[in-house]
Curated annotation (Swiss-Prot):
GO terms for cellular component: extracellular space. Its main location: secreted. Keywords: Obesity, Secreted, Signal. It is found in: Secreted. This is Leptin. Key player in the regulation of energy balance and body weight control. Once released into the circulation, has central and peripheral effects by binding LEPR, found in many tissues, which results in the activation of several major signaling pathways. In the hypothalamus, acts as an appetite-regulating factor that induces a decrease in food intake and an increase in energy consumption by inducing anorexinogenic factors and suppressing orexigenic neuropeptides, also regulates bone mass and secretion of hypothalamo-pituitary-adrenal hormones. Pfam families: Leptin (PF02024). InterPro entries: 4_helix_cytokine-like_core, Leptin. Belongs to the leptin family. Coiled coil: none annotated. One of its GO terms (molecular function) is peptide hormone receptor binding. One of its GO terms (biological process) is positive regulation of p38MAPK cascade. Residues 1-12 form the signal peptide.
């Protein structure tokens, strides 16, 4: 109860700041993934060149689908033996928090997706990602005819 007076003085974070922080964090994650792939002799076919579910690149995907995809990737990262991926996993958690903040700002709060529950849909996410990399349309990747 003693916190209530302080809560009235807290200003809302401008949505533009949240969007900018989201973009910066995405760039940081991609850079960290690329750094790992350079230091651990990963094949160029396996290298990450970007994240297809970034808002703005493929507006067909919903915020909840993006959150689900991030939860899947986070689950995969936490199961890898490398210590280098711990920070990336933490970054993904922060990115998911920003995504939830963006959704709340649009009055559509997201349910918390859980990695283990969403891991079953990994095949669909990977297929959509591969289709987009091969030049398919976002509609095809989303399964819309």
């Amino acid at each position: 109860l003693w916190l209530w007076p302080y809560l009235f003085f807290i200003e809302a974070v401008p949505i533009r700041k949240v969007q900018d922080d989201t973009k910066t964090l995405i760039k940081t994650i991609v850079t960290r993934i690329n750094d790992i792939s350079h230091t651990q002799s990963v094949s160029s076919k396996q290298r990450v060149t970007g994240l297809d579910f970034i808002p703005g690149l493929h507006p067909v995907l919903s915020l909840s689908k993006m959150d689900q995809t991030l939860a899947i990737y986070q689950q995969i990262l936490t199961s890898l033996p490398s210590r280098n991926v711990i920070q990336i996993s933490n970054d993904l958690e922060n990115l998911r928090d920003l995504l939830h903040l963006l959704a709340s700002s649009k009055s559509c709060p997201l349910p918390q997706a859980r990695g283990l529950e969403t891991l079953a849909s990994l095949g669909g996410v990977l297929e959509a990602s591969l289709l987009l990399h091969r030049g398919g349309s976002p509609e095809q990747a989303a399964g819309v005819s």
